UniProtKB/Swiss-Prot annotation:
UniProt PTM comment: Different length molecules ranging from 17 (85-101) to 30 amino acids (85-114) have been found in the venom.
Site annotation Endothelin-receptor binding site: residues: W105
Cystine pairs: C85-C99, C87-C95
SMART domains per the UniProt record, alphabetical: END
Tissue: Expressed by the venom gland.
Residue ranges listed under propeptide: 24-84, 112-118
A GO term from the CC aspect: extracellular region
GO molecular function, one term: toxin activity
UniProt protein name: Sarafotoxin-i2
Pfam families: Endothelin (PF00322)
Signal peptide: 1-23
Organismal lineage: Eukaryota, Metazoa, Chordata, Craniata, Vertebrata
Gene source species: Atractaspis irregularis
Entry annotated with the keyword Disulfide bond: yes
Length: 118
């Protein structure tokens, strides 16, 4: 339901922009605002897509967004991932389901208490 007001506001903004242009070509700044959704990107947001590497010398080297996986692999040592769960075996379906959802599950060895009837 929250998507509907956003779509209505976006459509209204587009209609107002088209009415203001009245057949004239759109200025580049208006086109950029429409493409960005009316929000400006800050320098921090623009820099978030870059990795700065000081490995080979004093000059920082910026790595583009497409190379981030390669740069991360090159800089990080190989290590085994830590197991998230302590499932006793593959037949414990509840534990395996939580592991699949990345929820930590710790099996505790408890003895089941017998059912007491009155």
């Amino acid at each position: 339901m929250a998507l509907l007001p956003r779509l209505a506001a976006g459509g209204l903004l587009l209609l107002m922009a088209l009415a203001a242009l009245d057949g004239k070509p759109a200025p580049p700044k208006l086109l950029q605002k429409l493409m960005d959704g009316g929000q400006r990107r800050s320098e921090d947001q623009a820099a978030a897509g870059r990795i700065i590497d000081y490995e080979d010398g004093d000059e920082p080297v910026a790595v583009s967004v497409g190379d981030t996986k390669q740069a991360a692999r090159a800089l990080s040592p190989l290590r085994k991932p830590q197991p998230l769960c302590s499932c006793a075996d593959m037949s414990d379906l509840e534990c395996m389901n939580f592991c699949r959802l990345d929820v930590m599950w710790v099996n505790r060895n408890r003895k089941p208490s017998p059912i007491q009837s009155s």
